Every structure is written in C-alpha cells, then in structure tokens.
Amino acid sequence: MAARLVVDAKCSYPAACNAVETLLWDPEATAALDSCVSALSAQGVELRGCKETRKRHPQMNAATGADWDTEYGALILSIRQVAGLDQALAHIARHGSRHTDVIVTQDPVAATRFLAEVDSACVFHNASNRFSDGYRFGLGAEVGISTDKLHARGPVGVEGLLTYRWVLYGHGQVTTDYGPGGRHYIHKDLPVDG
C-alpha cells in the first residue's frame, strides 16, 4: 500500500501544493521502503536520502539539511529514516508545512496518535495526501489555501473566526482512481455529533 500511496502523492501532479515532499520511514518498515524506492525510481523521481537511507539504497543522492524544508514542485523526494513515531512527529513539527501529513500504518494506536498530534490542516491515515483539495472536500473551486490557524483580515464576522481541520481515515485510496472512467466523488452532508 505504501508504494501506491507515495507514487500517487508525488507523481500524479508533482507541482501541486499537496504533493508529498519528504518520506519518513521506520527501520522496521524496510520492505515498504524498498517497494517505495523501486516504484518512485520507476517513475523517474529523483530520490535524496539521509545517511541511513543511503546505506540501504546507495544509488540515491545525499539529502542535505535544506531538503527537509523544501517544497520541490518537481519529481524530487527526500527520504529520511526516523526511530519511531516520536521522532517522526518531531521531524514534522520542525520541518512540516502544516498543509497535509499522512501516516501509513496498520497500527491503529499509532494512527490515532499521529492524527491527534500533527498540527496540520489535513491529516490522513492510509490515504494519499493528494485528497487534500477543496473540490475533493466538496467545497467547490479552490480559491486559495492556508496553513495558518487564523487567516481573516479587516472586519471579521463569525465565519471569519472559523478554521477547519480535515482528518481522513483511508484504506489505501489514491486520487488516480477517480475521474473519467473511474470512481466518482460523492458530495453530501453527513450528520455531525457535537
């Protein structure tokens, strides 16, 4: 599942603001890393790895400190090994854009913690970050994005004080499955407890 998600997240539209820029991996997930590297390489993605990642995949370029903070807008992806969820959360808190972050795991406890603790506008479990899109959320045409928590200026009414955080639980969905000849988005109001 990880390889399919990361290929969609990087290759379906690499210049998009919701394209993945950094892949973090746990040392217990070497098989998933290997399949991601293979799939991304087959798509022509330039991979830049940390020292630990390059020990496993010496063919990739060395990542620099700047890579962890770069929005490439191209077929380039940085890859970093992290020692567990705590280190992943710390990396995201320091280097993340606060736009969209994804965890790919079968561990529901880790997923729940990730979704609760990552301070991004959109946090997803087992789904491509390319789903982070106004149209896909049923908001109509997207006129802009914000990673700030309060974005209103000038006179502010109640609507101007509201912000949204999107949480998506998935089962391996990718955006390339949707569109002409494929699956369709369904936009409908859902009951909200509150």
Residue ranges and their predicted role:
Residues 5, 64-194:
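Conserved C-terminal structural/oligomerization subdomain of aldehyde/semialdehyde dehydrogenase
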Residues 1-74, 125:
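ALDH superfamily catalytic-core signature
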